[in-house]
Amino acid sequence: PFGRFADIPIYSDAYTAAHLRARMPYCFVDKVYPGVPRIYLQEVEAGQVFHINRTEVLPLRVMHGRLPILGYRIGGRLGYITDMHMMPEESYEQLKGLDVLVMNALRPKPHPTHQSISEALEAAGRIGAKETYFIHMSHHAGLHADIEKQLPPHVHFAYDGLEIDF
């Protein structure tokens, strides 16, 4: 499990890939010693479709504060975005027509690098997925059951172990 017997695939833009190689050089040598994660690093570009097996994946530009990062549209039906504070208009357009959106919603109060719950609700409303699941919440978000009651019927606070069928 967790890459012990197989490479862990990581799909990132060139900037992130360079930082991973610089900060974790021991993962990218020819002979990796026991206990070191085996990483398969694949560089991708925002707006350029790639495939994982036969599934189409579209990387989307989003911002983590001032740091450009990637979110993903997977298989045309799933959007996955974490660590986002805002996204450009083009990325909103690329997320239209989703069945499921998984997106970060850190806490009620604003944060410089993550969406607040109200910002996430606004972004989710603009995207218009059939179902939205908020992830990456802090302990400041409040109790799961209390927050869930305040969300629209198609928006949910995710939880560990959640499985989504769509």
Predicted segments with their positions:
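Binuclear metal-dependent hydrolase catalytic cores
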Residues: 1-80, 146-166
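Switch II (G3) loop of P-loop NTPases
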Residues: 80-86
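Cap/insert and terminal regions of metallo-dependent hydrolase folds
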Residues: 86-166
